[in-house]
Amino acid sequence: MLSTMKPLLVALGLASQAYAICYAPEPARRICYDEPGATPQNITLQEITYVAGYLRYYGSQPGNPQFYTMNLPDADNCGEWQVTTKGSTWVMAKLVGDEAASVTFDDIANTIDGGAGATPEQKAAALYGCGTAGGQMGVVVNAEDPRYQQPQFVNGTYTNQGIIIKLVRNPGV
């Protein structure tokens, strides 16, 4: 009897580990929502600038976490989480990897606006470059940031890869 159940047990074992896999992963490359097949979000550049600045400020305040973290199994199955909002602009995060991920609020902000004091070219390459249409892209990680040398990254508890940031319209506005 045990030998006939072996394939079933293996399948169940694999299925129990599959909870962490996003079966509809999205690419890390920037996608602007004015591309064919996408829906422009009609958000404002002022709000995009505000949310990026707010995220930098929030992550720098004593007592606040320095990292935005998406743990498993909480963030599995392609779940999208609200990071912050301002008016019509909603910043969402989606875990597309199969590992728990954590990134600095600075890296999220830089992904949105190209960085504090960004050049026009840096802004154009960031989500800000999608304009009022909004868009999405993988977090651009500053691998030189010493915060990524903390034990949770060195020991493999977290990766700094696999989080997609989306700028979309706040459905409540």
Report the location of each language-model feature.
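Intrinsically disordered, low-complexity segments that are common in secreted/host-exposed effector
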Residues: L2-T4, Y54, V168
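Extracellular low-complexity, O-glycosylation-prone Ser/Thr/Pro/Gly-rich "stalks"
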Residues: Y19-I43, Q82-V173
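Predominantly extracellular/secreted and cell-surface proteins with exposed
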Residues: N64-G87, K94
